Amino acid sequence: MEEPMKSLLIKGSLVLALAAVFGMTNASAAPLVAVEPTVAVVDGNHAAIVGANGLLNAFIQNHPNAVITEIAFDADGGQIKYEVEGVDESGKYELTYIYATNQIFEKREGDYHKSLKKKSFDPREILPPAAVVNFAYAQTQGKATSLNEWSVHHEKGKTIYKVTFGTEGAKEVDVRIDAINGTLLSVKFDD
């Protein structure tokens, strides 16, 4: 079993064990889809991961007191782009890196609002993006042909990864995974 999938299985088992210790007997993880052989689509050195991590570090250096609200990789449409969004007491910021032109743009998107902090997450507490992308790929039933985008953000009270793959016929499949515990939330194929 490859390390990313093993990591997800270990984290899932740990969550269930902790739930049992704390008396949460109804806790359950989404069933894993068995894929033979398991394919690693990306690793920690893949451009979809390295670029996002580098931009996150740059954002934290520029805004050391900020909390992160989104990290994203987007290759849909053929242009590779990375984005990190965050907020501190002085406002909401977005840092964007365009791979083709090697340009970084930062823009202030608005004023600080207390509600924005509720939509933040600690990037040190989420599952590694490479492991999540590989797990998401396994859920596509072999139909994924390209990694179009991934993002991690707060949605409906949870920090989630949304991973989008291209499929044949210019269609897509979206996979949503809990970014903290690895629970599979949904898999949606374009019709």
Please report, for each region that a protein language model flagged, where it lies by residue:
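Long, terminal "pre-/pro-" and other extracytoplasmic accessory regions
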Residues: 2-191
